[in-house]
Amino acid sequence: FTNRAISYRQDKNYDHFNVALSVAVQKMARSDRGSSGVIFTLDTESGFKDLVLINSSWGLGEFVVKGMVTPDEFKVFKPTLKKGFKSIISKRMGSKEKKLVYAHGGVEPTTEQGVDPVDRHRFTLDDGQILKLAKWAVIIEEHYQRPMDIEWAYDGFMQELFVVQARPETVQARKTGKVLEEFVMEQTGKIIAKGAAVGAKIGQGKARYIKDASQLSDFQKGEVLVTEITDPDWEPIMKIASAIVTNAGGRTSHAAIVSRELGIPAVVGTGNATEAISGGMEVTVSCAEGEVGKVYEGLLKFRVDRTDLTNFQPPKTDIKMIAADPELAFNYSFLPHRGVGLARVEFVISNFIKIHPNALIDYEKLTDMGVKQQIDELTAGYKDKVQYYLDKFAYGVGQLAAAFYPYDVLLRFSDFKSNEYAGLIGGKLYEPIEENPMMGWRGASRYYDPSFEKAFSLEVAAVKKVREEMGLWNLSVMVPFCRTPEEGKKVVEIINRHGLTNRITPEARKNKKNGEPIEGLEIWVMAEIPSNILQVDEFAEIFDGFSIGSNDLTQLTLGLDRDSKLIAHIGNERNKAVQKLIGILIPAAHAKGLKVGICGQGPSDFPDFGEFLVGLGIDSISLNPDTVLKASINIKAVEDKLGR
């Protein structure tokens, strides 16, 4: 007759005195000498069903389930795992400050221990163990024919993995996917706490700090629950909270699981919420901005966009997305799409890697101790600093490719300008000061330069890992800002030299269908410089497709500085000169058997420009996710008007 049991029976209309108990007895896996955790056979935040999500920490599993530690997190992609690939698409190290172990003597059977710093900075599972657990999870899911929530343990004495519990996942599995619901912040303010976002909603209200069960009766409906961790007995008050914020825990902790079931936003593992948020303070809790949940001071404005997809009819022109943030990719995968026409890797480099590649390559030679210390902090657990860059790059790109699989994902190799590269840790040691970086050392000219070729080779190696190790053959690559055919040849030769040799054949390219990945690699080029179009026949001999970069093409055709507001009024992609170039490119590329796409908001913002492109027979249009639905409807109307 605990609060939780009484509440459950009330919800289910069970008689309090007409229930029975059962007791299961099973061998205890000695994970106190190993590790343990939980597995979900889908992405718990988005409901993406092609993922196995594994959480793991040292010691007995109770700390992971209760959210008392921030565990390691691993993501495995099911479709290519089933084909025999090592499809680990993400590895994130948790802080793992403490663990639960058996107690020797005393009243309590278990006790809490601190984790050795060396163990905190290494993963709790190796790749073989991650893949074994993922395969078991897929077998269990296929047996029960539904997404599953699984607990597992690694016995440190026997050196064996065990599955100790499996039950149906009860939140995302119930969603129909017919109505898209998106919460959007309309204001920003002072951020007072950050942690892992649970769900994608926004909640707000007065904060109430609950230290222990004795204070539960103080909690009022609509308040924001702020606490160290939650306990199963707290579920009656969690139901009436507008949001939940905890100091400890990960995405599979008790607070996270119950929040998802209740449809309440939660930010877990903040570390400092109970100190940063005062009782009675009005706060807004946002889980709608990616994997990082934010607690803002004050009641900020937000909105909820709902779209019914029941009768949605896609256009014949491929509508693709512009994607950058791997943490949002699985949410965006539910939008109607035909893949990604521009995957921007700059976001991965600046937000996940944060270090200039040459600073990692030259780590042993660095004399700037400040830079070296920053690198040490970010690369904790990596003896090989170059491997850190390669792994982070591959995991970021791998998640983008997996989210939109089996449709094509076109990755643009890094297109930072020198001033942007200088902003990375160690970047000022390697980057020149240019008067106009927009027109300077960027794109293809970097890749074959002796001072950057090693750095570029890491990008190539990461793409090779994504395609050949993870099995994500839907990933293709694109070379930006390639001024001449000679530059194009140099870059393709470097790509081949560093391991990406399995190029698609012209015959395979001709027969290739979007949504049916094949092993051959496509290498596209951005058509963003007039020379790309004026020499289209020569570029077509080197590359497998063209992607129009309308911003740079407009800038370079009209001689505009696109960062200058003073001359922005002069023209955009609808200018006759720009359209004339596009009108040359599309039929010329088609005559050579190559496809042409465009990246940018023009077709969405200007219906007449969209009609112009469809009339020319453009193969794909890539847009920001928030305009995909609107643009799809507009392009379908244009196709109907033109009788396509």
Locate the predicted segments by residue:
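Conserved catalytic alpha/beta cores of large enzymes that bind or transform nucleotide phosphates
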Residues: 52-149, 154-157, 196-201, 221, ...
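Extended, highly charged
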Residues: 1-46, 57, 109-143, 147
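Conserved alpha/beta-domain cores
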Residues: 32, 137, 307-644
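Short coil/turn segments at secondary-structure boundaries
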Residues: 4-13, 146-153, 410-414, 476, ...
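Conserved phosphate/anionic-ligand binding catalytic regions in large, soluble enzymes, centered on
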Residues: 28-74, 148-173, 253-258, 328-349, ...
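Structured core elements
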Residues: 22-26, 38-41, 52-55, 149, ...
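Beta-strand scaffold of nucleotide-dependent catalytic cores
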Residues: 35-44, 48-104, 161-167, 175-178, ...
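Acidic, glycine-rich flexible loop/linker segments
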Residues: 157, 169-173, 193-196, 201-224, ...
